[in-house]
Swiss-Prot record:
InterPro entries: Anth_synth/Amidotransfase (IPR050472), CarbamoylP_synth_ssu (IPR006274), CarbamoylP_synth_ssu_N (IPR002474), CarbP_synth_ssu_N_sf (IPR036480), Class_I_gatase-like (IPR029062), CPSase_GATase1 (IPR035686), GATASE (IPR017926). Residues 168-355 form the Glutamine amidotransferase type-1 domain. Pathway: Amino-acid biosynthesis; L-arginine biosynthesis; carbamoyl phosphate from bicarbonate: step 1/1. Its EC number is 6.3.5.5. The active site is at C243 (nucleophile), H328, E330. CDD domains: GATase1_CPSase. The lineage of its organism: Bacteria, Bacillati, Bacillota, Bacilli, Bacillales. This is Carbamoyl phosphate synthase arginine-specific small chain. Composed of two chains; the small (or glutamine) chain promotes the hydrolysis of glutamine to ammonia, which is used by the large (or ammonia) chain to synthesize carbamoyl phosphate. Tetramer of heterodimers (alpha,beta)4. It comes from Halalkalibacterium halodurans (strain ATCC BAA-125 / DSM 18197 / FERM 7344 / JCM 9153 / C-125). L-glutamine binds at S45, G216, G218, L244, Q247, N285, Y288.
Length: 359
């Protein structure tokens, strides 16, 4: 069936779709990884977004049972140049098209993705719609992602514990990826997942050894009412922030954030460790960054920077056992170069024990 990607600028790209039932609006972004489409479509950080894949052939290894980052699709739609009709992998349980049909996830094919990405790079991430009828298109009633309670949409509503013999880590869920949980469990941590709006008192009753502030979708300032609690928690327990968690911790301790013209989304983002000068290839998915000039009035030290655009990719607190990274050390998809971040965090937790930093 003929279908279209229509940008908010009015520019239209024609393609084909097999599973369209209604128009789907979202923020159009692009992902530069050659693989990892299954992780992308199920990553809560992509909530509400139409994802353009820059690699020309998507779906060639199908969908399997083990690479999901959440229990359901999170992206609003997928846009590809060409898709493989079959999944050629021994673990594949269905094709990408079959999965999208099953979950009513729009999969728009035959699109000139190079042209779309060029527009995004020139004009920034923007509203867009996948439609089969150009006469229906109207952005007047579309609710921008900046006005949606995205974290509330993806965060857990209950407390859940996974047993382990190591340190007890409370994972504050802003839209966490399954691979972050797996990275802690493989280190034999006991992990308790709590909602994003958890109170200090509830966390205190759980008696954690450390806290992990997870990734998630949207603008960190959408939940700035949580900053006082985040400040109190991170001042009390050794903490690691990843992606959105990194931004929230930065805000809670006095820094500021801003939106990039187009975000970092891919499995090939180079960052440099400012202390060792070691370069890492990292997996990233974010639209917002910490403003470097806002660090001057805080107790943060920058630890990582993006080599491509010089943006802040990591922080450590000068006096408290808090470290943050904008990238994803658990990867999935992507390289595991920065997996040592988890080791460093566990070392902080072990060194501190259950002693509070200060009351």
């Amino acid at each position: 069936m003929k279908a279209y990607l229509v940008l908010a600028t009015g520019e239209t790209f024609a393609g084909e779709i097999a599973n369209a039932k209604e128009d789907v609006y979202g923020e159009v972004v692009f992902f530069t990884g050659m693989t990892g489409y299954q992780e992308v479509l199920s990553d809560p950080s992509f909530k509400g977004q139409l994802v353009v894949f820059t690699y020309p052939l998507i779906g060639n290894y199908g969908i399997n049972a083990s690479d999901f980052e959440s229990k359901e699709p999170q992206a609003a739609g997928l846009i590809v140049s060409e898709q493989s009709e079959e999944g050629h992998h021994y673990e594949a349980t269905q094709s990408l098209q079959q999965f999208c049909d099953q979950h009513q996830l729009p999969l728009l094919t035959g699109i000139d993705t190079r042209a779309v990405v060029k527009r995004i790079r020139e004009q920034g991430d923007m509203p867009a719609v996948i439609t089969t009828d150009l006469s229906r298109v109207s952005f007047e009633e579309w609710v921008p992602l900046s006005e949606r309670a995205l974290v509330d949409e993806v965060s857990t509503k209950k407390v859940e514990t996974f047993e382990g013999n190591g340190p007890h880590i409370v994972l504050i869920d802003y839209g966490f990826k399954q691979s972050i949980l797996n990275s802690l469990l493989k280190r034999d941590c006991q992990v308790t997942i709590v909602p994003y709006d958890v109170s200090f008192e509830v966390v205190q009753e759980l008696n954690p050894d450390g806290l992990l502030f997870s990734n998630g979708p949207g603008d960190p300032k959408q939940i700035e009412d949580r900053l006082p609690t985040i400040y109190r928690l991170a001042s009390t327990y050794p903490s690691l922030g990843i992606c959105l968690g990194h931004q929230l911790l930065a805000l809670a301790f006095g820094a500021d954030t801003e939106k990039l013209r187009f975000g970092h989304r891919g499995a090939n983002q180079p960052v440099i460790n400012l202390k060792s000068n070691r370069v890492y290839m990292t997996s990233q998915n974010h639209s917002y960054v910490v403003k470097e000039d806002s660090l001057q009035r805080t107790d943060w030290d920058a630890t990582f920077k993006n080599i491509n655009d010089g943006s802040i990719e990591g922080l450590t607190h000068k006096y408290l056992p808090i470290q943050t990274v904008q990238f994803h050390p658990e990867a999935h998809p992507g390289p595991s170069d920065s997996d040592e971040i988890f080791h460093s965090f566990i070392d902080d937790v072990a060194a501190k024990g259950r002693e509070k930093t200060y009351a």
